[in-house]
Amino acid sequence: MLDINYIEQNLDEVIQRLNKRNQQDYSDDLKYVVSKNLKRKEILVKSEALKSRKNQLSKEIGTLLKEKKVDQSEQAKIEVINLNEQIIKLDEELRVVNDQILEKLLYIPNLPHKDIYFGKSDEDNVEIRKSNHSNLLKHSTPHWQIATKLGLVDFEKGVKLSGTRFLIYTGLGSKLVRSIADLLLKRHEKHGYKEIFCPLIVNKSAMLGTGQLPKFSEDMYQVGEQYLIPTSEVPLTNLHANEILAYDVLPLKYTSFTQCFRQEAGSAGRDTKGMIRLHQFNKVELVKIVHPEESMNELEMLIKDAEDVLNMFDLPYRVVELCSGDIGFSSAKTYDLEVWFPEQNKYREISSCSNCTDFQARNMQTRFKDKDSKIKLVHTLNGSGVAVDRLIAAILENYWDGEKLILPTLLRPYFDNQEFIK
């Protein structure tokens, strides 16, 4: 969430920057938060004054008892009882005001970075660069048809077992998922990421920490009081919640391959066929926890790490900077990597790399000691490295020659050095 003191001191600027998101007008919510924060400060001043008076009286009572001034000490005790009642009442008022502030803040998104492109939707995103790779085979068969023809995926049985937007990888399809995940994790390990094998179920505080809750609750799968992860960004970023890290341990870089789960509540009618939009999907995630002054440089390196995956497979792709109206809730700045799908004749997102600045860190209370031993919030970044199902779909469409799937060279050792699947 945002820093309430920054909001209070820079209200007009915060309103202006948030309104660039083109999602809603946050003016009333922000003014409400500021007014409640002033109320909170008033309560704290009153409470501290009462506590100070109570402490003073407690000392006086001891002195009065020593001097055997019983009547005066009894009067002081009565005043202490009254003060306690007032303090309890103020504490309850403070709890209510804090809850009111938190309830609003948790629904207010991160500030877009000051140099971000202004735009209303994904149509206003800006292409930064394209790869030099091209679709060599020039065939345009839908990936789901190729997957079915080769027996790599059973879409019908996925629906039979679990419903729409579920699938089953079979035979060489299962091996394809496993080999790609292994390949990606090894690559990211070489780039300094530490592999984590993390839980697929997390508690509510973890979801609050990264900003999935409360705003996106309808998109989450809930298991009792816990949640299936929508991405391993959630457990990886929360690894250091409520911790104060030493200066020299940063940056921390984590990677994980997991299944991810999303309701896709707002995606009715979109990508109903194939492997692009699933309720359960496979992804290799990249997370960084860094010094604030290094976060923008770390974002550029994060993009390069994700690009490296697509370059490994010689897939055509482009890098797009998201405009102010398209960035995610917790993000200050985001770049998408989009891979070419010849059958659709367009680029589709396969990785999203974001700098969340101190937005998530404030929720999680993940801090570090700077060189002067001052406690500060870290910055957090995350990116797909990459979405495995979408990568497989892109390989199917870009490496299909009309009769067989040409296996990318670096995958062949996993398939007994065979050159194609037919």
UniProtKB/Swiss-Prot annotation:
SUPFAM superfamilies cross-referenced by the UniProt entry: Class II aaRS and biotin synthetases (SSF55681), tRNA-binding arm (SSF46589)
Cystine connections: none
Pfam families reported for this sequence: Seryl_tRNA_N, tRNA-synt_2b
Superkingdom per UniProt: Bacteria
Annotated EC: 6.1.1.11
First-tier enzyme category under EC: ligase
Binding-site residues, L-serine: T231, S232, E233, E285, S384
The family this protein is said to belong to: Belongs to the class-II aminoacyl-tRNA synthetase family. Type-1 seryl-tRNA synthetase subfamily.
Description of how the protein assembles with itself and partners: Homodimer. The tRNA molecule binds across the dimer.
Name the UniProt record assigns to this protein: Serine--tRNA ligase
Annotated organism of origin: Mycoplasma capricolum subsp. capricolum (strain California kid / ATCC 27343 / NCTC 10154)
Gene that this polypeptide is encoded by: serS
